[in-house]
Design a protein with these regions (language model features):
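Short helix/loop capping segments that flank catalytic or ligand/cofactor-binding pockets
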Residues: 13-15, 57-60, 155-156, 182-183, ...
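Short, well-ordered amphipathic alpha-helices
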Residues: 127-132, 185-186, 219-222
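Hydrophobic, small-residue-rich alpha-helical packing segments that form membrane-like cores
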Residues: 132-143, 150-154, 160-205, 211-212, ...
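Conserved nucleotide-binding/hydrolysis micro-motifs of P-loop NTPases
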Residues: 20-21, 54-55, 151-153, 178-180, ...
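Glycine-rich phosphate-binding loop plus the immediately following alpha-helix
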Residues: 40-53, 223-246
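Gly/Thr-rich phosphate-binding beta-strand-loop-beta motif of the actin/hexokinase/Hsp70
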Residues: 1-24, 189-232
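Phosphate-binding loop and its immediate beta->loop->alpha context
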Residues: 20-167
Length: 246
């Protein structure tokens, strides 16, 4: 079984499937969607929320004091000073110490009781939730691919690996635009790929534009078949923080 995880700026999602099969299934992740209401959903908002004491919210899946998932997304939008958002894009922000407890970002005199986490800490929590859901579904995690923006530098990639290692996931990194092109290849099949290469004299250059919740990722791929099919990323956008809320 192969597991793929997209640790997104706004949402985290995981999928799994047998290596010899085209069948892919999205992982359903149980989460609080309202007070006292738990639902399994395919999208896990990449948000942590520290409830007010008067709210009495307890997340059965998350270490206190934070609430995770859809309810966290809703409440953090209403009281931004109590929410941790966009941890992924902070991983690539060279202007801050990404292992320091800097999130929630900014000073907020009204929410001084909110614990602060580092971008790596927050990312590890989302991955821990995914791993717990995989374990609950009895899906083995010995072959896990974790996607990252092509624009991530080596530091951001190492920090992403650190977050995965903390929660017991041994992963291989794959650039997100390249993962998207692999999916296109799967959809068009061998015939579609052959037509593409025939039309480009055996070598195609593909520009992949990945517009996400916190990053806009551009990659130029070279696809050739001399003598066998190869895919090389020959250029990537330089802008790490194009888009998002920071």
């Amino acid at each position: 079984m192969i597991v793929g995880i997209d640790l997104g700026t706004t949402h985290t999602v995981a999928a799994f499937g047998a290596a010899a099969s085209d069948e892919i299934e999205l992982l359903k992740i149980p989460q609080l969607v309202a007070r006292g209401v738990v639902e399994p959903r395919e999208l896990l908002p990449s948000v942590l929320y520290a409830p007010l004491e008067s709210e009495g919210l307890v997340d059965p899946f998350a270490p206190p004091p934070f609430v995770e998932g859809e309810l966290a997304r809703l409440r953090a939008a209403e009281i931004p000073g109590r929410g941790i958002v966009s941890a992924k894009s902070w991983l690539s922000h060279a202007g801050v110490d990404r292992n320091a407890p800097i999130l929630p970002w900014g000073n907020d005199d009204e929410n001084v009781d909110v614990p602060h986490l580092s971008p790596v800490d927050a990312s590890a929590r989302y991955l821990a939730r995914v791993k717990a859901s995989l374990d609950q579904a009895e899906i083995k995690t010995n072959d896990v691919v974790l996607t990252v923006p092509a624009s991530f530098d080596e530091s951001a990639r190492e920090l992403t690996l650190e977050a995965a290692t903390r929660v017991g996931l041994k992963v291989r990194l794959l650039e997100e635009p390249q993962a998207a092109f692999y999916d296109v290849m799967r959809r068009i099949g061998d015939d579609g790929l052959a037509r593409l290469l025939d039309a480009t004299n055996g070598e195609a250059r593909i520009l992949v534009c990945d517009v996400g919740g916190g990053t806009t990722d551009l990659s130029l791929l070279k696809v050739s078949r001399a003598p066998e099919l190869t895919i090389d990323r020959i250029a990537a956008g330089r802008h790490l923080l194009l888009g998002g809320d920071n």
